[in-house]
Amino acid sequence: MSESAFAERIVHNLLDTDFYKLTMMQGVLHNYPDADVEWEFRCRNGEDLRPYLGEIRNQLERLGDLTLDDGQLAFLERISFLKPDFLRFLRLFRFNLRYVHVGIENDQLFLRLKGPWLHVILFEVPLLAIISEVRNRNLHPHMRLAEARDQLYRKFDWLRAHASDDELAELQVADFGTRRRFSSRVQEEVVRVLRDDFPGRFVGTSNVDLAWKLDIKPLGTMAHEWIMAHQQLGPRLIDSQIAALDCWVREYRGLLGIALTDCITMDAFLGDFDLYFAKLFDGLRHDSGEPVAWAEKAIAHYQKLGIDPMTKTLVFSDGLNLTRSLEIFRALRGRINVSFGIGTNLTCDIPGVAPMSIVLKMTDCNGAPVAKISDEAAKTQCRDENFVAYMRHVFKVPSKE
């Protein structure tokens, strides 16, 4: 019988998070160490998570004793753009549980984060992973690693049957599956199998711990929170995306050059993504809306600015599987470079298992609301309808309701 899919402890170390959390955390340390933020948890499909509150609290409390050890620190020191002062700070960092509020409210599990951005930023990914795994081990207590592994090999067989050798040589796929994974053990097994046997090009993982353990590349640049926070960090709202991109450029000097486009909408983003940014950033990340139509806008924008699209890369990360990735790859091949970050479909695709639809999103920065509109109406998120309406007015975004 194969090994259980579950470990007693869900999050084992500080690096069991997405790489862009560390890159943004460094940016916060250097630029906004005094910013205060609030976050709220949402279960999009209304699943009743109240029975798991005790187990979630138990795993949450165990985050408080996590520290960075010498081996993990040595791994991070090899990443040139992580600066010595940030690594010293991370060596001293501890999760402060007084910034986390969890309980039952309105007959639902509620979870809120409130505190300094610098000290709250690392909570998101492990908290979501904890909620997902606690739920899964209650619903599927006898799940074995072999079931996840067998499902992944079936996907490899499908890909070999449907893609040519030339296509496989160019098809770049990464693991972006930490936050809604079935379990930590399943994600590690999936990433190990991808590294060893993926028929295309496996280019890395967003999970820093697995990158360290399995000797592969950690991947990620920025998340929505980086751009959202700038809506309340000082500049005029109309200049907030420009301020976010400009701060990133000053922090990383041309490295980590994949920009996220859908905090407001792709059209609003391209209005701010001028020749300066288009030359400095290596490419763009898609996270909502129809992917090929989005890519056509990106290609046209680069061409309008006199930039060869084949010098740039588009990263796709919105609810992908291998089938959809191959379709997008074929639609854009030879016109612009593409790469695919696949999450839940790699780390929580097991027969008989329904993945969770959960998010933990920033709602406020420095006491005022922030918003994500996105290129997909269902992904719009803000606690203040008036602020969303104001943002739509400022950026000339029509309402999709």
UniProtKB/Swiss-Prot annotation:
Function text: Catalyzes the synthesis of beta-nicotinate D-ribonucleotide from nicotinate and 5-phospho-D-ribose 1-phosphate at the expense of ATP.
Any idea which residues bear Phosphohistidine here? H224
Keyword vocabulary terms for this entry: Ligase, Phosphoprotein, Pyridine nucleotide biosynthesis
Enzyme Commission designation: 6.3.4.21
Task: State the Gene Ontology terms under molecular function.
Answer: nicotinate phosphoribosyltransferase activity
Give the catalysed reaction(s), semicolon-separated: nicotinate + 5-phospho-alpha-D-ribose 1-diphosphate + ATP + H2O = nicotinate beta-D-ribonucleotide + ADP + phosphate + diphosphate
Name of this protein: Nicotinate phosphoribosyltransferase
CDD domains reported in the protein's UniProt record: PncB_like
**HAMAP family linked to this entry:** NAPRTase
Say which enzyme class the record assigns.
Answer: ligase
Record-linked PANTHER family: NICOTINATE PHOSPHORIBOSYLTRANSFERASE
The text of the family note is:
Belongs to the NAPRTase family.
Keyword Ligase: yes or no? yes
Mind telling me which InterPro entries this protein's record contains? N/Namide_PRibTrfase (IPR041525), NAPRTase_N (IPR040727), Nic_PRibTrfase (IPR006406), Nic_PRibTrfase-Fam (IPR007229), Nicotinate_pribotase-like_C (IPR036068)
A GO term from the CC aspect: cytosol
Gene3D superfamilies in the record, alphabetically?
Answer: nicotinate phosphoribosyltransferase
Name of the gene encoding the protein in the UniProt record: pncB
Species name: Pseudomonas putida (strain ATCC 700007 / DSM 6899 / JCM 31910 / BCRC 17059 / LMG 24140 / F1)
Q: Which GO terms describe its biological process?
A: NAD biosynthetic process via the salvage pathway
Query: What residues form the membrane-spanning segments?
Result: none
Checking Pfam families in the record gives: NAPRTase (PF04095), NAPRTase_N (PF17767)
PTM info: Transiently phosphorylated on a His residue during the reaction cycle. Phosphorylation strongly increases the affinity for substrates and increases the rate of nicotinate D-ribonucleotide production. Dephosphorylation regenerates the low-affinity form of the enzyme, leading to product release.
- Pathway(s) the chain acts in: Cofactor biosynthesis; NAD(+) biosynthesis; nicotinate D-ribonucleotide from nicotinate: step 1/1
